[in-house]
Amino acid sequence: MIISSWNVNSVRARIINIQEYLKKFSPDILMMQEIKTQEETYPFDDITKLKYESHVFGQKSYNGVAIISKKKIEKIEKDIFKDKNKQSRIITANIKHKSKTIKLINIYTPNGLSLIHIWRCRRSTGC
């Protein structure tokens, strides 16, 4: 089973790239972060044409996560952490594979720091 993860930084802006990726690599599951769209504007048809089903926990303009799969996904959970700011950052699901259940956890966690800050931290302290 091939499971991929991709911060797409807007699923609608990258739909051509996503379709090309799915055609070329044919992952069983693709977990996307920062989809930046609500369910109402998610490109379900573009994904379904490639024989994938989509499960979306979206948010307008920011955040948002999705799991797309060739196989049936069960027990989809959205908003499992009660976020008072209502940020769509985590979606979980179960999938059966070879008589076992695999728990998929897709989380969008921005670090909020510039890359130069992280580089300096690693360089000076080894963190």
Q: What do these predicted regions represent?
A:
Residues I116-C127:
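Single conserved hydrophobic/aromatic residue that forms the stacking wall/gate
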Residues M1-E53, Y62-V65:
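N-terminal, active-site-proximal structural segment of metallo-dependent hydrolase catalytic domains
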Residues R12, E74, T125:
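Nucleotide phosphate-binding site architecture
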Residues I35-Q38, Y42-G112:
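Structured beta-strand-rich core segments of catalytic domains in phosphoester-bond hydrolases
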Residues S10-R14, N85, R120-R122:
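Soluble or luminal CAZymes and related metallo-dependent hydrolases
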